[in-house]
């Protein structure tokens, strides 16, 4: 059954074939073949983006590792400046393998890959995964980012199921979780993205179960991103915490 909330729109006739292939892959209608939908995937010369269609809707969101905030940040990433690096246990001579079990738009995975980690990105919502795949493909063509992007490996599927099915041999050193929660960040970008995301996926109601699956699999630690003043996920006390202004990282040492 197709998702009646989303349709696909293409900007020019030369993109029609690609749009039709994407529609078939995601089981979504093209915009002209359905009634108005709350969300629309837009395929144009800049890549793939996702937008709400309401009259008061913010602009579209797109995964862009090359320019904008992520491109600026990538040039300035360092071990000392990244609390995430400390949370996952990156050291001068050590780069753990990481599974980002809630990949979303790939920002935290990109930071970890920029610091030298091999990162498996798990995203269960196929539309978000399509946005991420498009961003990775475009970034891989940038000479300055090619090595970083090569360390990012996207898997579309449910994180809990994927973790439960792992064999003993390829267990990751670290599993990272950033469950969907109401952000306190009031920036226009965060508000725009959260509005689109909540329309599409809502909150991560199964985050406690995913945490349990992660704790059973991670060789070294599980890291959970939380609002600074929130209770630990599932009330489970972490081994230690890395605090920040609006968020913190709860670290669960497993080995």
From Swiss-Prot:
Name its species: Thioalkalivibrio sulfidiphilus (strain HL-EbGR7)
Main localization (coarse): cytoplasm
Task: Note whether S-adenosyl-L-methionine occurs among the keywords.
Answer: yes
Q: Which reaction does it catalyse?
A: guanosine(1516) in 16S rRNA + S-adenosyl-L-methionine = N(2)-methylguanosine(1516) in 16S rRNA + S-adenosyl-L-homocysteine + H(+)
Q: What are this entry's molecular-function GO terms?
A: rRNA (guanine-N2-)-methyltransferase activity
Q: Where is this chain's protein located in or outside the cell?
A: Cytoplasm
Q: Which CDD domains match?
A: AdoMet_MTases (cd02440)
Give yes or no: UniProt keyword Methyltransferase.
yes
Region annotation (Disordered) ranges:
228-247
| UniProt-recorded name of the protein | Ribosomal RNA small subunit methyltransferase J
A Pfam family of the record is SAM_MT
- Which top-rank group of organisms is this from? Bacteria
Q: Which UniProt keywords apply?
A: Cytoplasm, Methyltransferase, rRNA processing, S-adenosyl-L-methionine, Transferase
Q: What role is this protein assigned? A: Specifically methylates the guanosine in position 1516 of 16S rRNA.
Q: Where does S-adenosyl-L-methionine bind?
A: 107-108, 123-124, 178
Per the record, its GO cellular-component terms are: cytoplasm
What are the EC numbers? 2.1.1.242
Q: What is the lineage of its organism?
A: Bacteria, Pseudomonadati, Pseudomonadota, Gammaproteobacteria, Chromatiales
Family, as annotated: Belongs to the methyltransferase superfamily. RsmJ family.
